[in-house]
Amino acid sequence: MIQIEWNEKKLNSFYNKMDKIAVNVKKGSLEGIKKATEETQKLALQLKRGSNKGILIELLDTSTNKIKGRVYTDSKNFPYLVYLEFGTGIYADPEGGGSRAKRIPWYVHVSMADLSRYGYPVYTSPFTGEKFYVVAGAHPHPYMRPAGFKMRDKNIEIIRTAIQEMIKEAVKWYTN
């Protein structure tokens, strides 16, 4: 016959610690994702040309046991950022959805900007007589995709470390 004895107080303490671990894993995940998105945002801002604005962070709904973070461009206040990332006209990156852009030049009305100093040809509409500069477009200067790829491994490590720290906190009693 096998006889088993246990200390009810220690068993209850163990159950409480396990509950604390479950809570801390979610908390650690959230902290890790928050830090990872902040680090990705910081790198994207370093890679982006121009002002250090227009790149936002959002932590998505955590009530579904799925924690998600995203770094994205503020297209409402900075609508040109997609063109900076993917380019325009014949230089457009196909990943940006610009498959037609390889065949279509851009037309800029002469009243919008004086581009004569750049030597762009001028097209006169046979229908309206209006004049347009014919421009090829702008080369892409990606910043979001490189930041995401460069931060991929580091983000995994940031999240892993945050979860490990929360678990260590929950099981401190065990290591003492």
Regions found by a protein language model. Give the residues of each.
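Short, His- and charge-rich active-site/binding loops that engage polyanionic ligands
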Residues: 89
